């Protein structure tokens, strides 16, 4: 019986033909092997041609691991062969994009893609790409730089350290001035009866002592005599006659005076040292007499003042 008479004049038959297994394996092998590009010497460029120096220790920023680009594989589709029964001829049409164009009157099943063909190759490539990403992503932890301190916000301003003068006047405590001399009416505590010295200060960035004693020694060249006696003495403990060259109680008194007499021929300013030393002692006594607030009596009775309104600085005798 004629097939045209059975199915009618407007019917069509679609036959789906799949490629053989040998052709699939051969095509998969050809797609996996990609030709590698060979670069010439002119195309090769130096990545880092210069050194980069930094002022301090720094951590090199490592580039982020690049993910391996996934290779898009064009999967094969089934070969759709439409057969027109009316005209008795075969029209084969292969679609590479997964869509088959059929005549308007023919309605046949269309298979878009076949995922079973490249399953083995895609699973192998995915596993290799994931392993490479895992190795690149595991970077060693950065070690802290020794001596590096973490930055902290300063909340308190630095304060200037104020050093009080050792010979400065101390604050008077009214509770200490309770022992009053019965004869002169002045305080007999240790602070008030201590002798007052001439004022002095530090000059030249706190390196030189400026006082009346140093002015007398440098003005009369006595500092030079002390330096010579210091280098000639054998006493290493520091208690030598170089500190007091004019002292009569220490050893080598005659030799010291003879040496200073010989040096006065070349340094006549040494002859001014005895009168300058006498003037210095007189100035000390005058300054102490004026500025000492305590009692100077040698033999006197002491009265303890219990009243808060009693005079503590010799304003009057206590009753």
UniProtKB/Swiss-Prot annotation:
The modification N-acetylmethionine is found at residue 1. PROSITE patterns: SPR. It comes from the Eukaryota. Keywords: Acetylation, Cytoplasm, Developmental protein, Membrane. Residues 183-295 form the SPR domain. Residues 54-78, 100-160 are annotated as: Disordered. Residues 69-78 have a biased composition (Basic and acidic residues). Its main location: cytoplasm. Coiled coil: none annotated. GO terms for biological process: animal organ development; bud elongation involved in lung branching; epithelial to mesenchymal transition involved in cardiac fibroblast development; ERK1 and ERK2 cascade; establishment of mitotic spindle orientation; metanephros development; negative regulation of cell population proliferation; negative regulation of epithelial to mesenchymal transition. The Cys-rich domain is responsible for the localization of the protein to the membrane ruffles. Belongs to the sprouty family. This is Protein sprouty homolog 1. It comes from Homo sapiens (Human). The gene is SPRY1.
């Amino acid at each position: 019986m004629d097939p045209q008479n059975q199915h009618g004049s407007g019917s069509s038959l679609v036959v789906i033909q799949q490629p053989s297994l040998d052709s699939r394996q051969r095509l998969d092998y050809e797609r996996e092997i990609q030709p590698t590009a060979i670069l010439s010497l002119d195309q090769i460029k130096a990545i880092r041609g210069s050194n980069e120096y930094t002022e301090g220790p720094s951590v090199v920023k490592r580039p982020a691991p690049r993910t391996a680009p996934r290779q898009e594989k064009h999967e094969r589709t089934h070969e759709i062969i439409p057969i027109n029964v009316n005209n008795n001829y075969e029209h084969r049409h292969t679609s590479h994009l997964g869509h088959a164009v059929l005549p308007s009157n023919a309605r046949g099943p269309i298979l878009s893609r076949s995922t079973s063909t490249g399953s083995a190759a895609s699973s192998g490539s995915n596993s290799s790409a994931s392993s490479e990403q895992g190795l690149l992503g595991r970077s060693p932890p950065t070690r802290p730089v020794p001596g590096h301190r973490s930055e902290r916000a300063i909340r308190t301003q630095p304060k200037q350290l104020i050093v009080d003068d050792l010979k400065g006047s101390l604050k008077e405590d009214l509770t200490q001035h309770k022992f009053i001399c019965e004869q002169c009416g002045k305080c007999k505590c240790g602070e008030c009866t201590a002798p007052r010295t001439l004022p002095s200060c530090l000059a030249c960035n706190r390196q030189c002592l400026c006082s009346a004693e140093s002015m007398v020694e440098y003005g009369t060249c006595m500092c030079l005599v002390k330096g010579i006696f210091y280098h000639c003495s054998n006493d290493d403990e520091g208690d030598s006659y170089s500190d007091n060259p004019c002292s009569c109680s220490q050893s080598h008194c005659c030799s010291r005076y003879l040496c200073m007499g010989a040096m006065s021929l070349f340094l006549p300013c040494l002859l001014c040292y005895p009168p300058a030393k006498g003037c210095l002692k007189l100035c000390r006594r005058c300054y102490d007499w004026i500025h000492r607030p305590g009692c100077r009596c040698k033999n006197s009775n002491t009265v303890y003042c219990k009243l808060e309104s009693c005079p503590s600085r010799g304003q009057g005798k206590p009753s």
